[in-house]
């Protein structure tokens, strides 16, 4: 993995937050789809 110098100096937290938001989005979408199909 290359480490590019980041002018904003943002840590890994941004990637971690986007990862958690993606997992939350997939989870909510799965729950809504399952409730839609089972009703």
Swiss-Prot record:
SUPFAM superfamilies: Photosystem II reaction center protein L, PsbL. Disulfide bonds: none annotated. Keywords: Membrane, Photosynthesis, Photosystem II, Reaction center, Thylakoid, Transmembrane, Transmembrane helix. It is a single-pass membrane protein. Coiled coil: none annotated. InterPro entries: PSII_PsbL (IPR003372), PSII_PsbL_sf (IPR037266). Pfam families: PsbL. It is found in: Cellular thylakoid membrane. One of the components of the core complex of photosystem II (PSII). PSII is a light-driven water:plastoquinone oxidoreductase that uses light energy to abstract electrons from H(2)O, generating O(2) and a proton gradient subsequently used for ATP formation. It consists of a core antenna complex that captures photons, and an electron transfer chain that converts photonic excitation into a charge separation. This subunit is found at the monomer-monomer interface and is required for correct PSII assembly and/or dimerization. PSII is composed of 1 copy each of membrane proteins PsbA, PsbB, PsbC, PsbD, PsbE, PsbF, PsbH, PsbI, PsbJ, PsbK, PsbL, PsbM, PsbT, PsbX, PsbY, PsbZ, Psb30/Ycf12, peripheral proteins PsbO, CyanoQ (PsbQ), PsbU, PsbV and a large number of cofactors. It forms dimeric complexes. Belongs to the PsbL family. This is Photosystem II reaction center protein L. It comes from Synechococcus sp. (strain CC9605). The lineage of its organism: Bacteria, Bacillati, Cyanobacteriota, Cyanophyceae, Synechococcales.
């Amino acid at each position: 993995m290359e480490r590019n110098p980041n002018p904003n100096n943002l840590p890994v937290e941004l990637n971690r937050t986007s990862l958690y938001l993606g997992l939350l989005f997939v989870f909510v979408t799965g729950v809504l789809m399952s409730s839609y199909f089972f009703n």
